[in-house]
Amino acid sequence: MASHKLVLDDLMEDLSFSLIGIHCNLEDYKLAYLINKALDINLKRNENDLTFKNGASYSFFEWENEKELKHWSLVSNIYKQEIKITESKGSLFSNEITTRTIPLIPEYRKVNYFLKICDEIQSINETKILNTIYNIPQVVTAYMINHEQLTSKGNLIF
């Protein structure tokens, strides 16, 4: 009996999507609200965050536009994990809490959020969307990212 293997690179080639990196200091719900208002879309918080085996969990908003065959996803790139470190100093123990940041896409660790737009009929105007997001006053910068060159593109399958 023949076996069929799916290769991640083959799967990613079949996907047609645009990826926008967004830098801002806003909470996830506030950015989703401002993007909804600016682009006239309806991103809603998913019941389940995007969670990985290493314990990292990223906030996740999505909206399916069935009329235009587009799927919008806003995902946080930053997960902060508090780690308790116990150090021995003589006969006393010192407990110290440090924060470790785990990015969803390590190649873009400075990006706060990613907006992923899956478009089945490839009718999206990337420039218009990018300019609209860039013109949100609380957004520091936003730019297109070539997802084909990412080594961690498997993290974008959701």
List PLM regions with ranges.
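Primarily extracytoplasmic/secreted proteins
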Residues: 23, 63, 106, 111, ...
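Surface-exposed, low-hydrophobicity interaction/linker segments
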Residues: 50-97
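Glycine-rich, aromatic-bearing surface loops/beta-hairpins
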Residues: 110-158
